[in-house]
Amino acid sequence: MTTQFSVAGVELELLRYPAQQESNLQAWDAADEHLLKSLIESEQAAVPTAIINDSFGALSCGVSKLNPSWPLCVETDARTSFLGTEQNHGRNQLPLDNLQWFTSRDTLPENLALVLMKLPKNLSYFAHQLTRLSQVLPAGTRILVAAKAKSINGALLDVFGNHLGPASASLAWKNTRVITCVSDGKPRPLAKEVTWAVPEYQLEISNLSNVFAANKLDIGARIMLENLPKGDFKSIVDLGCGNGVLGLRTAQLFPEADIHFIDDSEMAVASAKANWARNQLPADKGHFYWDDCMTHLPEEVQPDLVLCNPPFHQGEAITDHIAWQMFLDARRRLKDGGILHIVGNRHLAYHVKLQRLFKNCTTVASNGKFVILQAQKK
């Protein structure tokens, strides 16, 4: 893995967050390079700029390297992106006082004169981001969006036109392109919230746009709900909670328990919190954390059950480091005798990791694609 970023005279040292990861993953990609290269070649003045979907700070560090006083609004939905960007600014002796931080639900300032953006995997989320920009950007504002060349087509350019303004793509460089969109100055309304029922559990669920499983139970959650553990649980963590459906169901089954919802996505945590209220569950029993696994979970929280459906993607990268960290955090934070109860794709072989960490692992249920595993802290 290289940590040395070099584009058009800008030299940086950049690491992913957390830093202890596979050696084949780096903290930026060619789309970051292309976008920063385009900015430098345009000799852009240091105007108020939004940087959106900057994975670990390559863009904000690069722009700050060009001009440490360049006013930047950095928007991210991922806690790991926020933490990684902070660390990489420190690693390169770059100030943070030129940065304002925003989540994907915050209202952006109206003085923006430029937007630099990476194309996210989730196009519904992307449409939401463009719509939010349409509500604050004056006509004529440029939005530069970098992506893999294979991701750019006529349908994507139509998304720009429908939600923000006309767009065109650059020539390819390192298999990436930069789309230039010009705001038409017409504010669009945000999409209406979609709520859907899970009748077998008497639950009503809604998701914000960057939350997995838009309008139905995903298969992994369904098999998990069918195989929740039995016991006398008082403190439960829904780790990587998404819309919170697992934690909501455990609140029904164990009404005396405190349920702690944790996710790297701010939209996921907000969705879980809204769903808790929507289903009229006790306000004092639900606790919500936008966090990198259990890194900042209060020390007094000692769960006797952790539920987990680990992701194996971080942005565009396929990686098992998130699952490893979730399992390690569970082992560290569980009470003696506490249970880690997970669902995963069979091919990911999580049983090997759990056996290594906990010295025990039981297969609770399985089908052709998924397996439910349980390990106990002893």
Curated annotation (Swiss-Prot):
InterPro entries: DNA_methylase_N6_adenine_CS, rRNA_m2G-MeTrfase_RlmG, RsmC/RlmG, SAM-dependent_MTases_sf, Small_mtfrase_dom
Single GO term (MF): 23S rRNA (guanine(1835)-N(2))-methyltransferase activity
Any single Gene Ontology cellular-component annotation: cytoplasm
Keyword terms of this UniProt record: Cytoplasm, Methyltransferase, rRNA processing, S-adenosyl-L-methionine, Transferase
Predominant location: cytoplasm
UniProt subcellular location: Cytoplasm
SUPFAM superfamilies on file: S-adenosyl-L-methionine-dependent methyltransferases
Family named by the database record: Belongs to the methyltransferase superfamily. RlmG family.
Role summary: Specifically methylates the guanine in position 1835 (m2G1835) of 23S rRNA.
Protein name: Ribosomal RNA large subunit methyltransferase G
Species assigned in the record: Shewanella baltica (strain OS185)
